């Protein structure tokens, strides 16, 4: 459920909405833009092993790598740095070179299971306003369907 937007002062004036204090920049040489700082998905009640066992065939993306997002369209692509092919609800073998591709809003609507665990990670978000530190956190989530790109190993 969308609760709010990240809006800096200038964006708020343009859209007639109040600023949420989301303007960030690397340093004074960059113009500020609306940027994430701490982004989280709350923990759910599903067991991680059960999510895999009931998925049928798919990809278990254990660790994600870098990627990019088009803020105008919500389109994204992210590398899977550690992934496993799942066949009949069982982890079959590791995969390499996989990437997840989609549109943020559409993929969020396809989350069908949310795990009990919750982990955090630090990263860097690069944009026109420079590179700034970020903090993200989420439990394991299962997405009913999405585009997976890559090549045969």
Show where each model-derived region lies.
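N-terminal small-residue-enriched
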Residues: 1-153
